[in-house]
């Protein structure tokens, strides 16, 4: 039978009307509810550049509204190698998701589809994509900043090769995954390793001194 209903939407399309319906369905059926929100990055300059049509405030509002309902989990989609973003943006995005208490994260590696605005920018040299090594570093930095209780359901994304001008540095997603996990193991890095910045962390630092 059905064990979960997952609704994927934009942060600026979440309202009490729809959340009430999800709450009622859960009450009648006992089925777990999940809302998937596409944030992509906490950098509002990048959100504007890629024409997302919403900012960080709408995402925060959506999460806080969903949090008022029991039995509705939150999954957030993030792209860590958007043009203009840096490792600092990956870190700050992770920290915001942690502070908001999201339950699930899906990481996407940027691919550039043919016949799109990004494709034109990429082919004309207006934008570049970071190296595979830099992406690995951003993913690991992101993972270190989120609690180990957050489920990470994806770390790479892809489309058919014929439809893309750039996708995963020409590598298969499973090879990238294996390389990433090996790098984390070799460097002693893991999810949640640096998740110690909430609950008045500065006060704790002062006390330790």
Q: Which residues fall in each region the model found?
A:
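Conserved strand-turn element in the central/C-terminal portion of the radical SAM core barrel
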Residues: 12, 38, 44, 66-89, ...
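Hydrophobic faces of well-ordered beta-strands that scaffold small-molecule active sites
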Residues: 5-7, 33-37, 74-78, 105-107, ...
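Aromatic/hydrophobic pocket-lining residues that form the small-molecule binding cavity
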Residues: 59-60, 86, 90, 135, ...
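Auxiliary Fe-S-binding modules of radical SAM enzymes
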Residues: 98, 104, 111-209
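Conserved SAM/AdoMet-binding glycine-rich loop
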Residues: 1-56, 61-62, 68-69
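Surface-exposed alpha-helical segments enriched in charged/polar residues
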Residues: 20-23, 64, 68, 95-98, ...
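Catalytic cores of alpha/beta
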Residues: 16-22, 83-99, 162-164
């Amino acid at each position: 039978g059905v064990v979960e209903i997952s609704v994927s939407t934009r942060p600026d399309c979440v309202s009490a009307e729809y959340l009430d319906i999800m709450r009622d369905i859960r009450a009648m059926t006992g089925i777990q509810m999940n809302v998937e929100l596409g944030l992509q990055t906490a950098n509002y300059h990048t959100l504007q550049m890629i024409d997302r049509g919403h900012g960080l405030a709408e995402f925060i509002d959506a999460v806080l509204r969903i949090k008022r309902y029991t039995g509705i989990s939150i999954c957030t989609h993030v792209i860590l190698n958007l043009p203009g973003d840096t490792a600092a943006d990956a870190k700050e995005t992770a920290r915001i998701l942690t502070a908001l208490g999201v339950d699930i994260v899906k990481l996407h590696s940027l691919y550039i589809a043919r016949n799109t605005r990004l494709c034109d920018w990429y082919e004309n040299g207006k934008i570049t994509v970071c190296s595979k090594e830099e992406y690995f570093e951003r993913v690991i930095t992101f993972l270190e900043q989120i609690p180990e209780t957050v489920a990470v359901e994806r770390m790479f994304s892809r489309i058919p090769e014929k439809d893309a001008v750039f996708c995963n540095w020409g590598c298969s997603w499973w090879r990238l995954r294996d390389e990433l996990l090996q790098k984390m193991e070799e460097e002693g890095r893991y999810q949640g390793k640096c998740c110690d910045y909430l609950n008045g962390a500065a006060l704790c630092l002062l006390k330790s001194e």
